[in-house]
């Protein structure tokens, strides 16, 4: 895999607050190599490590995108939800930003069945078929459609398991991460000082609470994916 330059600067990371970890009482000792110091009761993340692993992650997603691989971005906490949706849409990736339904990947047959139902209901709504039903039946199906849109809207075009999963908050998305580990799907994980860096294939140490920090990491990854897609189209 060729190493590329992704213009990751310390200035922009500092400005986004990427270096601010959790309080020193709330930490995982496995994160020690990724912490540079303690300041006012807070662990400060080593941005040299952040730049290194973010660059590695960008190389990985560029390479995967240039070969037509499929991505899933997961981030369901309130602060990350909109950022995840916007990033995924920009990069033409699938995403989950509301709630991770247990077994979404490990029980793919059930997920596929739900997606099929979702697509059928969307088609019926667009063609006006739902409005031709008795009011009670139409109301039930519209509620079902709304529920499916909320939880599966970001993966409605997914036809198989993703090749790489990007996870915004390891603690919040632990179930999703475990499913990826079970299935052997490579993961890129944004990890704060209370996380376990050994669980993901590439762990990017960074503040997972600040919107600016999450946005910066996602923007770098999305740019790399978009560049990879462009390379794939040129060579197709």
Curated annotation (Swiss-Prot):
GO cellular component: chloroplast; mitochondrial small ribosomal subunit
Intracellular or extracellular location(s): Plastid, Chloroplast
Pfam families tied to this protein: Ribosomal_S2
Biological process, per Gene Ontology: translation
GO MF annotation list: structural constituent of ribosome
InterPro entries documented for this protein: Ribosomal_uS2 (IPR001865), Ribosomal_uS2_bac/mit/plastid (IPR005706), Ribosomal_uS2_CS (IPR018130), Ribosomal_uS2_flav_dom_sf (IPR023591)
PROSITE patterns assigned: RIBOSOMAL_S2_1, RIBOSOMAL_S2_2
Record's keyword terms, sorted: Chloroplast, Plastid, Ribonucleoprotein, Ribosomal protein
Superkingdom of origin: Eukaryota
PANTHER family: 30S RIBOSOMAL PROTEIN S2 PROKARYOTIC AND ORGANELLAR, SMALL RIBOSOMAL SUBUNIT PROTEIN US2M
Family: Belongs to the universal ribosomal protein uS2 family.
Name listed for the protein in its UniProt record: Small ribosomal subunit protein uS2c
Organism: Lotus japonicus
């Amino acid at each position: 895999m060729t190493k590329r330059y992704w213009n990751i600067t310390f200035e922009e990371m500092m400005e986004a607050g990427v270096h601010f970890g959790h309080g020193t009482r709330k930490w995982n000792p496995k994160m020690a190599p990724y912490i540079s110091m303690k300041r006012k009761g807070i662990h400060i993340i080593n941005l040299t490590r952040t730049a290194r692993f973010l660059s590695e992650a960008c190389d990985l997603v560029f390479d995967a995108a240039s070969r037509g691989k499929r991505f899933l971005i997961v981030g369901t906490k309130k602060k990350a939800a909109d950022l995840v949706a916007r990033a995924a849409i920009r990069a033409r990736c699938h995403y989950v930003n509301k709630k991770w339904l247990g077994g979404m990947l490990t029980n793919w047959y059930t997920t596929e069945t739900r997606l099929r139902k979702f697509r059928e209901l969307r088609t019926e709504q667009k063609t006006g078929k739902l409005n031709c039903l008795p009011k009670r039946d139409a109301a039930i199906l519209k509620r079902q459609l709304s529920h499916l849109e909320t939880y599966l809207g970001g993966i409605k075009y997914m036809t198989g398991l993703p090749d790489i999963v990007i996870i915004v908050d390891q603690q919040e998305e632990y179930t999703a991460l475990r499913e990826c580990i079970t299935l052997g799907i490579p993961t890129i994980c944004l990890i704060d000082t209370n996380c376990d860096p050994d669980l993901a294939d590439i762990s990017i140490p960074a503040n997972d609470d600040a919107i600016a920090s999450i946005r910066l990491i996602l923007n770098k990854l999305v740019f790399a994916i978009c560049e990879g897609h462009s390379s794939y189209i040129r060579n197709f």
